Amino acid sequence: MRLNTLSPAEGAKHSAKRLGRGIGSGLGKTGGRGHKGQKSRTGGGVRRGFEGGQMPLYRRLPKFGFTSMKSAVTAEVRLNELTKVEGNVVTLETLKAANILTKDIQFAKVILAGEVKSAVTVRGLRVTKGAKAAIEAAGGSIEE
């Protein structure tokens, strides 16, 4: 068996009906669109969210919240990712050099996920309580 010899089982595929090709086809003349009306015309149809003139749901509900732009430049770093860094000092620059963070990240926070095996010094990063305890238990330290 080769990839170029594969084909669907006999009768598994139905060919689509061609629209507007005579009354004998079953989908001639109006081509399944019915008679007249907005949906029968070329380019016809109502916009997304339109409810026939009734006040649509997206306008009935109040606006709320916003998207913080800070989230685009902030990242979380897992404990097990700290072992991928060269040396035993972890900073924002060393995390970027190890391809753990992208170049546009400006803030990072170490979170308790996975485990840290070696003693590392975390410098200039925010650290959660659980992650701080795990780093210090492994013999590491946190510097501001």
From Swiss-Prot:
SUPFAM superfamilies: Ribosomal proteins L15p and L18e. Part of the 50S ribosomal subunit. Binds to the 23S rRNA. GO terms for cellular component: cytosolic large ribosomal subunit. This is Large ribosomal subunit protein uL15. InterPro entries: Ribosomal_uL15 (IPR030878), Ribosomal_uL15/eL18 (IPR021131), Ribosomal_uL15/eL18_sf (IPR036227), Ribosomal_uL15_bac-type (IPR005749), Ribosomal_uL15_CS (IPR001196). Keywords: Ribonucleoprotein, Ribosomal protein, RNA-binding, rRNA-binding. Residues 1-53 are annotated as: Disordered. Residues 21-31 have a biased composition (Gly residues). The gene is rplO. GO terms for molecular function: rRNA binding; structural constituent of ribosome. Belongs to the universal ribosomal protein uL15 family. GO terms for biological process: translation.
